[in-house]
Amino acid sequence: MYLKRKVYDQLLDWKNDTVHSTLEVNGARQVGKTYIINKFADENFRHKIYINLFDLSGKQFMECYKKATDWTPGTKRPEQPLHDAFKLFDPDFEDTNDTVIIIDEIQESSEIFNRIREFTRYFQAHFIVTGSYLGRVLEPEFKFSSGDITSIRIYTLSFKEFLEALDDQLFQKYLSLPLDHADDTVPELYDELKNVYDIYRQIGGYPKVVETYLNTKDVEAAQKELVRIIRIFLNESMRYFDDITDISVFTNIFLSICRILLREKKGLDEDSISEELQKLVTKNYSSNLSKATCYRAINWLYHSGIIGFCGKITELDILNFKPGSRCFFMDLGVAYYYLSRTGATVSTMDGSLNENYVYINLSKRQEFPEEIIFETPAFATYKGGEIDFVAQTLKTHIRYLIEVKAGKGTASTALKALEQGKANKLLYLKGDTKGGTVGNVQTCLLYTSDAADDLI
């Protein structure tokens, strides 16, 4: 089953760019990287070579690489050993602009990863490298070549992509809805969209999970597939840790993230989310887990695309920006799965899931080419209160205060900050409204705006 993905357009932009670079495609395990890259390659290049360093093709290529690069001192050096390696692997290989070489799971070999600069500079062929656990390339033996790489991140399906896959007619109606006011002629449309969003919140956007739901229309069956994906990730992660022997360590971190998100008292007791998580995990689960190991596990989850960090702007002073002050999940289905295991009430879960949804969409808009400023999405404190998110456009410099509400409530802290000139606009993203604009305060449905993507 083909699920239409927005990232396909980014792949085309890379191919057509006059700057010749190696494309690094990153993203969490099972987000569909291999499928979309191979589809793109098949449709846009005359010849494709696919190597997965995690399976037999990788083993075979490494044998070709070793044979092509072997050299005895005192003898003539090979003129093009890297070209020879690909020729040994695929006798039909030609170094032309219409050839693409895909090296999957690149993190499995520092030797090949460190050749990226040469792939970029000495080949006419295009190179795409990808991996699910690129956190490993931060280790010393991996030499990063930033000037030769264009990076693209593939996320799980967005709500828009899920809606289009589920019901194209409903998707077209969704696109026609006005964002700045209510359309009272189609009340049933708002109800339909809310129902789809509720399903999306429960299952998230992993392609196999979405496919399962599309085939069965069964939320529980889709969640079962999600659990399978989570377990694959946890078990595979164990390969990269010598001092973690039980996958429950990662589960404990996930549950601790949920409990921090569910707290009524805002802010952290510790200086960073990593320190707060380490304290919770060792207190509630394993006092034998070292601080260093816990930090590495959290970092691993971040670089594997499972969690993301959120900054904090103290007293709405953008010069007082503190990164890594909160943590969110990068897929709504994963967030739902773990939040539902904390014993939280439905209304409390709703609030956390909606905030997580907005976080994911703001994160996407900070990928190149960036549309909003700051290193990561950020929340803010002001006059003893808190504002869910602050976003400022890169081109127009308009600053938005964003408040996420499950119902029809208002946000006194954000209103106060707006009145005192701390921002240009206040944007309410609500679960129970049809939208509207009053002055510089705009309200819209969470799921009709795809988390402010068309507003800011």
Regions found by a protein language model. Give the residues of each.
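N-terminal pre-Walker A segment at the start of P-loop NTPase domains
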Residues: 1-14
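Conserved lysine of the Walker
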Residues: 33
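Hydrophobic positions on the alpha1 helix immediately C-terminal to the Walker A/P-loop
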Residues: 36
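Sensor-1/coupling segment of RecA-like P-loop NTPase cores
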Residues: 122-141
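Interdomain motor-coupling "hinge/lid" segment immediately C-terminal to the ATP-binding subdomain
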Residues: 142-263
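Accessory nucleic acid-recognition modules appended to NTPase machines
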Residues: 221-386
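Conserved catalytic cores of phosphodiester-cleaving nucleases, focusing on short active-site segments
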Residues: 362, 387-408
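Conserved small/polar residues in nucleotide/adenosyl-binding loops
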Residues: 447-454
